[in-house]
Amino acid sequence: MKIKNRIIALIALLCIVIGSLAFIGCKNGGNTKINEIDYVAQLSLNMDSETKKQKVTVYNYIDGDTTHFKLSEPIENTNILKARYLAINTPESTGKIEEYGKAASDFTHKKLQNAKEIYIESNDSNWNKDSTGVRFLVWVWYNTESDSTFRNLNLEILQNGLAVASSIGGTRYASICQNALDQAKQLKLKIYSGTPDPDYFYGEAIECSLRDLRLNIEYFNGKKVAFEANVWRSISGTLYCEDYDEKTDRWYGMQIYNNNNGISSEAKAFLTMGNRVRIVGTVSYWETGATYQVSGLEYDPRPEPGTEKNYIKLIKTGVEPNFLEIDAAEFTGKQNVELELDEDVKKFDYAELALYTSVKATGLKVKKVYTTTNPDSSSVGAMTLTCEKDGKTIIVRTGVWRDDNMNTVTEDDLNDKTIDIQGVVEYYEGNYQIKAELYSDLLRCE
């Protein structure tokens, strides 16, 4: 009898232990439902606090934790504020592409795009900058047509599992931010889910030609690609490359965003004009320019056997830009080029196919000149030339030109003149134009 009682007691004890373990397992990712709290709804914007505040509108969407805002009143002599969101760090969606970077960027974009009003708030009584000395550290608040209550976007991004903490402890909303972050981890949201990001490409680089990339750009968006091309120009961290395709008898181009992060000096040396390079990077949509780019380049001088195809590589040197001379009517035409693609015929704008390639235009009559004078712009002194040839209008955008004597070239030097120019085909505010960045791109002016 005693033995039987002991057995029953042991079984009961075992059940208790197993039940306890099961309960613990549920609390750490099992089936126990966590009481989800909307921390954003608990935080309100105090317009009477000592912090700086200003109503703004969006100037440029950058990524999940960076936005450029147009100010209602200047701050430190600027009307455009480059905002870095306080307390958060979202995955990258420009430059190096990271998991859930696109999701974070899209989340911020959608919230601000649908906002009725947007306010920025400083962390204390001053407008403070981050370590770059360029971006201001702010809290971003917004409301909507359907809800006049302001919501803190920084906190909302954390609450939705789209960011990691960034110096939360030193901020005015530290406690509630930490609570939102802890909850996102408990709920295993987005970057804390442990599941693959559906918008992130995990496979090896897709081998393609530059022609295939350009003609199927939407398909390749978000994917890692590998192709060969001639680097023919480098401007402020952006490379322009081009390649000739015999099948269609055309040149195709691409812009490469290269902020040099993670790229060695050896790689930087061959990512220069005049080199043919194997490019390996991720295709992404560049919100500011409303076009596509390749970014996230990686280089390894001594790659492991079998991994060579995942890195950029120098193919050869001494390659010259093409500078194909364009016809004004052809360049400005719509749906005027037919290409046979996989037994299907598609129509394209000539300029669309020429995007990011090197071109030359001769005999352009300068009809109007606009000079950038906004001190907030990085291109003060650059000009937009409205030109005509054969009854067609071609727009030329210059850099800040200085002649051989280092004198700045102005509109007085160009108005009513006939010019020959060379440059890159770009897309700006719904139109294709020629970007002649260098003074040497002005081939003739008389």
PLM regions with names:
Residues 27-29:
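Bacterial signal peptide processing site
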Residues 11-20:
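Bacterial N-terminal signal peptides
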Residues 32-155:
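Electropositive
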Residues 95-106, 111-114, 147-148, 171-179, ...:
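Soluble non-cytosolic domains of exported or imported proteins
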Residues 92-99, 106, 122-123, 138, ...:
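Second-shell loop/turn segments in exported
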Residues 2-11:
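Bacterial N-terminal signal peptides that target proteins for export
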Residues 33-47, 170, 185-446:
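OB-fold nucleic-acid-binding modules
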Residues 22-25:
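C-terminal motif of bacterial Sec signal peptides marking the signal peptidase cleavage site
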